[in-house]
Amino acid sequence: MENSMTRGEMMKLSIVQLLVGLAIAIVLCAPGYGQEDVSKFPSKPITYIVPVTPGTGTDLSVRLIAKEAEKFLKQAIVVVNKPGGALTLGTAAIATAKPDGYTIGFTGGPPLFLTPLLEKVPYDPIKDIRTIMQYGGFNFGVYVKGDSPFKTFKELVAYARQNPKKATYGTVGVNGMPNIMMEEVAKREKVQITHIPFKGTSEGQTALLGGHTIFGAGDFNASLVEAHEIRLLMMLKDEPSAEYPGVPTLKELYNLPYPMYISIITQRNVPDAIVKKLDDAFAKAMKEPAFISGMKELQLPIIYRSGKDLDPYVLQSYNYFSRALKEMGAIK
């Protein structure tokens, strides 16, 4: 007797195998497969990656909000510093993490919309990352020596117009945001200014106080403002500064953006429900007295913005700096 299946039996078996395969594929592709029940999230500690060194103002702000958010998430938040690569090493670790919400991180903005334009990075800032929320901002500005004759930014511009290339200014590095925005302002005002890059904020401020530059742009030591050793002429930010009322912003004077913020990001494919849960917890943490007093001590403004509002701003900033860098000749 021939031990073989008939043609009909083979067809039936093939159909059964096909149906089983389809069923497995549907299950594997179903939303939420392999993910824990959102209602149980988080069921283990969350890793919070910070791409800067420990002890900086940014790092301390992360530790402040993480400590308060633990109360609402009922899980530990482990802060892990991954500095290097102009903040891209830590950002890459967030972008390539498992999209389960257990890896989140800090960004100030540039690793998403500026650095990727200037150098190759191991992530796509738009496709690989999403924002959970913003909880703070920075106080950056344009400043002169305390005894400078310039009392307003317009007076500084007038000097630059009358003295081409003699208005020297310091920032931290070439093609950083302060450098780009000062060149943008110079272009609008049709003046020529001279950029002098420094390795750090303190080095640039020392040069300013020593009379080696006319003005500085970017981060500054708040204690020097309080001691009247430097004078702020313009804030490099979108919103007026509560800490420095009366000082006009770049947005007010030139309608130019300065997208620097303290926000929490995660992998792009983390489910919306988990992102909302994280957003809610960190938003509550912002209202805790310890967080508020801590941010005040760090002299960092508290600003809330949802990821839904911030993500389009990231894309807008990416497009803006792409154009600005091309016009400066920094990229093709």
Feature-to-residue mapping (PLM):
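Short, charged, surface-exposed secondary-structure boundary motifs
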Residues: A207, A242-G246
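An extracytoplasmic/periplasmic, membrane-proximal ligand-sensing/linker region
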Residues: R7-G8, S43-P45, K187-V191, D272-K332
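Short secondary-structure boundary segments
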Residues: G108-G109, G146, D219-N221, K237, ...
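Short, low-complexity disordered leader/linker segments with a strong preference
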Residues: M1-S43, K332
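N-terminal (or domain-start) structured segment
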Residues: G34-D128, K165-K166, V174, P178, ...
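Conserved helix-loop-beta element of the AMP-binding
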Residues: R130, E229-A242
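Hinge/capping helix and adjacent helix->loop/strand transition within the periplasmic-binding protein
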Residues: A93-Y102, L117-E203, L250, N255-G294
